[in-house]
């Protein structure tokens, strides 16, 4: 039989390298002390399961594992799909068996990895159903590490923080992973704000985050993040390394830190010890929390991906996943069963599944200039960051307005970029509204044109999923990007146009390779904001309407 496990009961004498102490067709896979040789390098013949068809089972056979793989890494393969109830490592064979809590979870796992090849330590691995319906392990020394790892992981996954924080669980996790619970995080292509609260929102889906320190080094935004245990750190690294927080930017590069613990002295927008809420802020500057925490750490943000919080690679095909239900991971919010088109559209905005914006899409905008603000001006300004659906200026409090975006992620972008900027001479304040939608006035209700529905507006910038406009979203700046300029319009024409409403034009430059585009620099950010509101979609003739957006460049 050359060491292949047969599908019939056998009663022949077994050698020391035989894997099973009991072998029954489709019965439990029983690991005993006689299997010790299979964990070493002297066992040559074991080839795992002999199968011709992938009959679903709770037990999954993993092959071609890297020789230095850890128990934690193998367990992490199954975590996004449900609870891992047992593990058998055959390191000498570069194989493992994972037992899931349900056949459904195992089936989802195998289906997923059939379409997206799993990789551990840069090496492709292979996953298939086992012939065996369950794993039964004994108390042999070879199983001690696997069981300790399982206990540590499951204690965190089930929310049993007391057990997870116990010395035994932490020690077992350290021995299992051989790694620090501290991660070093570098964010590349930082086009949008990434704050301490953004990181906490993302990384807390994989375990209990104890401390975070953020800093800038070599002109790169970096962070150190400490988990309660190395298992969570391992899981987060495997799931998030190389992923983009937002589409096509803010790429996470994650490594283990040489530090085993962080020393946080202050709780502010740069550092946080979640176990010590009593720590001082350490400076007199207002914390970014006031403007950012509501945006990115808001409760109720849900995933537009059916694999909520699972941290799948960006290669995962969203349409294939629509409607699937996968058990939550580390308290991740409930997955949504949504149409594939909606899933694909949402995925084009936010790259990490657990951060996609199906949360509150309505913003409360206050401290407006009641003499000058109009629904149209708010539509154009907020439309730089998403597709505005409705705007309502409050009838009895015209310094306040509600702006409804297409989804929660767009609302968060608009809030993070516009909060505190001046509009019509006043610094606007923006928060998430308690309302879930903006109501249109009833027929006959006095409104004075203060409520507008823009749901079908042709001026939406982000109608097409994956549009390049998603990659050109920048905070308000004095420099504006102009496009769709006809050949007959000159530099002087545009300078005259932008100074006609009292603004000062400080600089202008056509793009060398494309005179349909240009940069124009106004006297201040406030002037640029006003110019964008007044001149976006301005008719330049020849069937050309000017497109205006904020630029990250200067002249």
From Swiss-Prot:
One of its GO terms (molecular function) is pre-mRNA binding. SUPFAM superfamilies: RNA-binding domain, RBD. Residues 58-142, 183-259, 361-412, 478-553 form the RRM domain. Its main location: nucleus. The keyword S-adenosyl-L-methionine does not apply. The modification N-acetylmethionine is found at residue 1. InterPro entries: HnRNP-L/PTB, Nucleotide-bd_a/b_plait_sf, PTBP1-like_RRM2, PTBP1_RRM1, PTBP1_RRM3, RBD_domain_sf, RRM_dom. It is found in: Nucleus. There is a cross-link at residues 64, 217 (Glycyl lysine isopeptide (Lys-Gly) (interchain with G-Cter in SUMO2)). The modification Phosphotyrosine is found at residue 126. Residues 435-457 are annotated as: Disordered. GO terms for cellular component: nucleus. The keyword Phosphoprotein applies. The modification Phosphoserine is found at residues 16, 140, 457. PANTHER family: MATRIN 3/NUCLEAR PROTEIN 220-RELATED (PTHR15592). Plays a role in pre-mRNA splicing and in the regulation of alternative splicing events. Activates exon skipping of its own pre-mRNA during muscle cell differentiation. Binds to the polypyrimidine tract of introns. May promote RNA looping when bound to two separate polypyrimidine tracts in the same pre-mRNA. May promote the binding of U2 snRNP to pre-mRNA. Cooperates with RAVER1 to modulate switching between mutually exclusive exons during maturation of the TPM1 pre-mRNA. Represses the splicing of MAPT/Tau exon 10. The C-terminal 195 amino acids of PTB are sufficient for specific RNA binding. Monomer. Part of a ternary complex containing KHSRP, PTBP1, PTBP2 and HNRPH1. Interacts with SFPQ. Interacts with RAVER1. Interacts with IVNS1ABP (via BACK domain); the interaction is direct. This is Polypyrimidine tract-binding protein 1.
